[in-house]
Amino acid sequence: MRGSVMFEYALEVHEEPGSVWLSCAEIPEMHAAGDTLEEALDGAIDAMETALSIYVDDRRLIPTGDAGEQESDAVLRLPALTAAKVGLWNTLLESGVSKAELARRLGVQRPQVDRLVDFLHHSKIENVERALQQLGRRILLSVEAA
């Protein structure tokens, strides 16, 4: 796919007696743990979304993940909404458009734009898509065999 971003992150599995924890070299702020690998993986999305929030708070670009290029113990694929929010956040930073300006273009209040890049808030993907369109971007979605 031309110019596509995968939003797949290579995870390292660390095992200790009675527990497992996960880390991600691309997003070092991400850590998930559990009694088993399955439990740790179950919490990995929440842990990743919390870690991505740190990038927004610090006004940093978010690495977009390309696990296919790396050796890894496990792979974390972002949900569609989370991936769209990463795309929106990175586009805002790269374009230099402020949240206030995006709010003006969308005809909404600034707090609504804040929520569009808040990984802990469940936005409607249509609203993220509309914001991306205002920035000259679009969402591409593909479905493939697991």
Swiss-Prot record:
Family matches, as InterPro entries: TTHA1013/TTHA0281-like (IPR035069)
SUPFAM superfamilies in UniProt: TTHA1013/TTHA0281-like
Keywords, sorted A to Z: DNA-binding, Repressor, Stress response, Toxin-antitoxin system, Transcription, Transcription regulation
Annotated GO MF terms: DNA binding
Role noted for this protein: Antitoxin component of a type II toxin-antitoxin (TA) system. Functions as an mRNA interferase antitoxin preventing effects of the HicA toxin.
Protein family according to the UniProt entry: Belongs to the HicB antitoxin family.
Subunit structure: Probably forms a complex with the probable mRNA interferase HicA; when complexed with HicA inhibits the toxin activity.
Name of the protein in its database record: Antitoxin HicB
Gene that this polypeptide is encoded by: hicB
